[in-house]
């Protein structure tokens, strides 16, 4: 049965606390609950259509590829690569944060997908990104209030990606940079990460009496309400109102956690990262169907003065939450000391299906986990099905008829979407780890854009390819054909660098 939050608290006969309201807002946000993807859809004629998430899953279910280990659940998709070895893949946008704080938004976007790979029990080995901005020569006088010049946004985003990837020691190996006026106010920052594991075992649910252990960074006010902010429509006031929603990245701390988890896979039962919602989302998700009790005063803070809801909801970076059996806590603590990673026990999983949070032993939140995760109202949406424009205009643009072939060629080569992106690619270290067998820039002097890249561990005689397909302008005329064209381009690119198309995944 579905309840509104007001009905839920009325039936309990209590007033909600600020911690409870913030937790529900985060858990039910578009960013976390994917309400649009899960919405019931009807067309203009009244016909029902599958939800978007079911449509996305349908092709994977239909193909039923034997090498797909896990999809549409958990932190990342997982495929088998070679006997005893698996790969995890995760991509995620960080658009709103990058629009109001380009460096920090892109910086923590990279950190977030890296932690998702860690949460899938894989070791990160490479990063990707697709970036779309407004035209760099946009007249600043024409920009809406509160919108940064596209050149400033672009430079900040690229700086943020380079800073995190280079410092953490992961190669940024594949991507794209595109420009269009449609991305002026809200850029596309689509970060990705690939990880590998030689010992992947599907996680089990936390068990009653398991300890809730937080590893890595400390909690601060950065990243407050990030999940709800990312689900909002932006306007001229967004940067001022939501500036604190952008987290502060710390790649060195995250690198220490990566190294720790590579040695600690046998010491925990379940793991996830503090992404959107911080402890609220991480513990809330892990406690679904189990229950948990948390004491917030045990959480390590960057500085004093945080309110309970701020400690619980902060999206401060580089933190992982683990479910650890009591008898393994001391071994994990010892390993944390060895790796220089902070270890904090803040509670336990209970088995009563209740999420209880206290501050100085006083309750500030008590919610049934079934209500928290399944009680949100179902969204219903009406789909307007535009007719694709599949006609062909054979008339040459007037500009082309007024210029010679040489002028046209130079104009094309100088267009931001065609011109070399080497200046961007060289900002990223794509050689670190020594596993980039086919590089993003190829040719006799290494200045030509390749079709894709190949990652092969130094002692292996095999590898895997990464390639990208992107064409947003196609979607203006025909969204369905755009998707087909992008997949077609990506497939041709992986084939061009020697990959087997029968084992490709999206």
Residue ranges of each PLM-predicted region?
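Glycine/proline-enriched, intrinsically flexible loops and inter-domain linkers
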Residues: 1-506
